[in-house]
Amino acid sequence: MKQLYGVIGNPIGHSLSPVMHNDAFEHLNMDAHYHAFLVKEEVLGEAVRGLKALGISGFNVTTPHKVAIMDYLDEIDPLAKQIGAVNTVVHKNGKLTGYNTDGIGFVRALQSISSEPLQEKRILLLGAGGASRAIYFSLADAGVKEIDVANRTVDKAKELIAACTATVHSVALSLEKATKEQGSYDIIIQTTTIGMHPRVEHTPLQISSLKKGTIVSDIIYNPFETKILCEAKEQGAIIQNGIDMFVYQGALAFEMWTGCVPNIERMKQLVIRKLGG
C-alpha cells in the first residue's frame, strides 16, 4: 500500500518539498507520495486529526503552524520542546511525535562546508527570531561552546541566550558592535529576513574585515546570493545560502520517516533547478 506523506501550511502552493521528496521516493523505488495540504489556522486541529485518521506516515509543518501544532501531538522531542517549534511529525504506532529538523538540518549543512569540527569554532548569529532559536539550540546541542547573538533589539538576544540550558559561552550584542567585532568570528550566520527578495539591497551587517577562512551562511535562498554573501565573497569568505539548510532539514525528515538516507546532492540540484538556478 502506498505510504502517504505531506506538508501542511498556509500558504503552501510555493512549497518545494513535494517535488524534492517525491523525486527521492522515485529514486529509491519507494511506493510513497508526498502532498502539499493547505491548512488554515482555524482548522489545524481538525486537519491533524484527519491526517492521523487517514494513516499518514509523516508530515512537515510550515508557516504559520510550527508552534500551534504542538498542542495536537502525542509526544514532542526534547530539543523541539526547547526550541518551541515543530516542523516534522512522525506517525508511528498510533502516535504523532513532533521534531524540529530546521536547526539540526542547518548544523549538518554547515558542517558539510567546514573542514574542521564546528565545536572548535567561534560563531556569531545574526537575529533572535524563530530560525535563530532553532539554530542556536541545535548548535549548542551539537557541542558548540561559543555562540554570540547580535540583534537589533539586544534584549531579545539576551532572552534567547537565557532560554538555553546547555553550557554555552554567549554574549548578546547590538548589530553595531557585531559589525566592529566581525573579524573575531570563525562563522557568521544570518538568520533574519533582511536581504530577501525584493529588498535585496539591505543587509543586517556590513562585511568589511573578516579573518581568513571565515564561513558566512545565510538562511535566505531568494536571491541565491544576498548582499551579505556578496560582500563576504569579495572578502574571500566561504559562503553558503539557505538551499543547503532547506535540503538537509528535508533529508533528515525523510530519514526519520523512512529509515532511508536520500541523495543530498540530487535533492540540492533539483531544488536549484526549480528555483531557476
UniProtKB/Swiss-Prot annotation:
Pathways involved: Metabolic intermediate biosynthesis; chorismate biosynthesis; chorismate from D-erythrose 4-phosphate and phosphoenolpyruvate: step 4/7
Family statement drawn from the similarity comment of this UniProt entry: Belongs to the shikimate dehydrogenase family.
Molecular function as annotated in GO: NADP binding; shikimate 3-dehydrogenase (NADP+) activity
GO annotation, cellular component aspect: cytosol
Described function: Involved in the biosynthesis of the chorismate, which leads to the biosynthesis of aromatic amino acids. Catalyzes the reversible NADPH linked reduction of 3-dehydroshikimate (DHSA) to yield shikimate (SA).
CDD domains in UniProt: NAD_bind_Shikimate_DH
NCBIfam families, alphabetized: aroE (TIGR00507), PRK00258.3-3 (NF001319)
Protein name listed in UniProt: Shikimate dehydrogenase (NADP(+))
Gene3D superfamilies: Leucine Dehydrogenase, chain A, domain 1 (3.40.50.10860), NAD(P)-binding Rossmann-like Domain (3.40.50.720)
Enzyme Commission number, as recorded: 1.1.1.25
PANTHER family the record matches: BIFUNCTIONAL 3-DEHYDROQUINATE DEHYDRATASE_SHIKIMATE DEHYDROGENASE, CHLOROPLASTIC, SHIKIMATE DEHYDROGENASE
GO terms under biological process: amino acid biosynthetic process; aromatic amino acid family biosynthetic process; chorismate biosynthetic process; shikimate metabolic process
Subunit structure: Homodimer.
Positions of the catalytic residues: 66 (proton acceptor)
Residues that, per the record, bind shikimate: 15-17, 62, 87, 102, 221
UniProt entry keywords in alphabetical sequence: Amino-acid biosynthesis, Aromatic amino acid biosynthesis, NADP, Oxidoreductase
Positions of NADP(+) binding: 127-131, 151-156, 219, 242
Reaction catalysed by this enzyme: shikimate + NADP(+) = 3-dehydroshikimate + NADPH + H(+)
